[in-house]
């Protein structure tokens, strides 16, 4: 089932320097909660500056949903330490609040209790909040409080020069983008390995269903927790952050221009379902527009091709201008065993898997085959640890045992690991392979099995409160390592100043401004 990558691996072993200079970035979301686990109702802490303009600390959907962002970094340990500093400083500024250590929220009785993220009075700020109003009215606020980790990854120019002979200019843009699309297609085919190993949301609080019927065969504990005994990541299931209305958009990952055309089509295609919500009611705007996507960021995807945008530029226009610059991996649940929601083992694994995905042959995929890849993902998400579980290839009927496919993949990853270790010294990447491959023979070692044991004993709420309290105490005590307190204060003040400048520069009324942007 695994493509034959022996030639590509042999090439890599002859050109190890092609992997020198991999760049990465990390984003982590987490809910602010009170000591009893309920959602914090306070505004974004003043000590953290402006959520609109702060470089490292912002908010996602809700005012209580923090998002931490590292700068681009070539060193995994340095990047994780930077992320830890963001957590350390924030933990000290949250008073009695703490950061929820799980992907799935708990103790939220009503979606109405969730305040949307606020970004001030500028047109840009109001637009961001209106977009979130649209998300709430389309999908419900509870779904939007699910947290995850995003991993941004780019290969060095030396890789593309060695692999494709690119230099600069239009031809380089096309070849590099084609290489990243190959990575993305392989990710859709084999990325289920990420929730298998690292999925950490095998259960949900009963309030999350809000009385809606479900066909999933949940087991229920006395404390009202619903779980699937072999599930890995309900966050990635249809219960979580997915969007069924997007499944027939026909967006494919074969060609830059095709992909962008599909994205642009989706933001211009009217939706009957969303038209029923209405765009405005009693003078209050309910969504930016009633199209399938309000804006491009609404496209749900487990992985995205990206390029840093210029001021006023849409993500797709940035891609057309310069091609794909990096990849955003979006399938990581919060790691409940780390105070910062992610750890070094995971990131080293993702490095290996990304390199494998770009090396392995990846035939073009129709939108139909893209839908078929969802079958494997759903099996792993809902019953990934089930004995005897099999996976297929695309829309074909042949089935293969998951443990065998996983071990075959890791045989290749071990060779990539040897190459990366030869550049950096040590055996860190090979160690990660040895640790993780054991999860295929013993699923009890996976994150989902480990956290489910705690959840069955303590409930989701009890587990979240215990872990959150322990991490709060730990982070508050640890000294900062990279950033200094003065730098946090300077960025707080600078972010507030930047927001004020944006607000002062706005002269157009929001309604007129929105008419141009909706």
Swiss-Prot record:
Record InterPro entries: Gln_synth/guanido_kin_cat_dom, Glu_cys_ligase, Glut_cys_ligase
Class of enzymatic activity (EC top level): ligase
SUPFAM superfamilies reported in the protein's UniProt record: Glutamine synthetase/guanido kinase
Keywords of this entry: ATP-binding, Glutathione biosynthesis, Ligase, Nucleotide-binding
Disulphide connectivity of cysteines: none
Record's catalysed reaction(s): L-cysteine + L-glutamate + ATP = gamma-L-glutamyl-L-cysteine + ADP + phosphate + H(+)
Family designation: Belongs to the glutamate--cysteine ligase type 1 family. Type 1 subfamily.
Protein name as annotated: Glutamate--cysteine ligase
Organism for this UniProt entry: Salmonella paratyphi C (strain RKS4594)
Gene: gshA
